């Protein structure tokens, strides 16, 4: 996904951030404003992984709101500290840990390292039964006119696997 999500109880969380360039973060702030959400009132950033297309805006966000907590895995916490100031408030979560936002909104967290990125985790909102799957099921593009992997030739499967290995080895 390239989307960010808001979960609002008594407290407010953004799940998955955005890139920090090309005006994308401005678009996020515009959408927050349209939904009557003040960026200064956001309590939590749920960082499902630190890939730059989801975390590149954290520094910019910190200039707007310096009173929030990042929720992430231990691997992501190390990356947050290496990319940004050490004074960012971080809560490290493990499998099954919960964050109660109030008003029936409870998030639970499930690390799935290396499914997409070394620090990947999934976030589940219990009341609505929505799984925020990060980039776990995401894919960009397709090979020729094939939408499903059972339509691929052996050569196309090999190309897909080679590209996956190239991606992870970088």
Model regions: which residues?
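Conserved beta-strand hairpin/beta-sheet module of binuclear metal-dependent hydrolase folds
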Residues: 1-35, 122-133
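Short coil/turn connectors at secondary-structure junctions
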Residues: 9-11, 42, 66-67, 86-88, ...
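Short catalytic-loop micro-motif centered on adjacent basic/acidic residues
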Residues: 13-16, 44-47, 108-109
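Active-site environment of divalent metal-dependent phosphoester hydrolases
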Residues: 22, 50-55, 78-79, 116-117, ...
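Active-site metal-binding motif and surrounding structural segment of the metallo-beta-lactamase
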Residues: 24-71
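Short, conserved acidic/polar surface loops in the N-terminal third of protein domains
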Residues: 26, 55-60, 81-85, 119-121
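Metallo-beta-lactamase
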Residues: 72-170
